[in-house]
């Protein structure tokens, strides 16, 4: 699947009731939110496969679910320290942090080496990254 196809698919799967439910759990990102459930994102990964360049585009999309999807299709061994920093600095909800750590950063030697550094940061979601990686 190409980037534009993925975005169209996410828009098609939009679920406003899920967005309301997410808000009740404190998921109120500044990015656009479609309310696509994680199991639907996992189904999409089967068609996309691993694609690091696409993953970076998805992280940069400004769409909540696309960013989570990016964490699922990225290749941990190709992550640079600069890419990790760029991703971490854009975190705006706990679920994106947790999913990115579980799906991607946990498999990255570079990200794991930054745990102590992340734990000393002031920004809530940057600090959470450290604790999600330790869990």
Positions of the model-derived regions?
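Alpha-helical scaffold domains
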Residues: 1-135
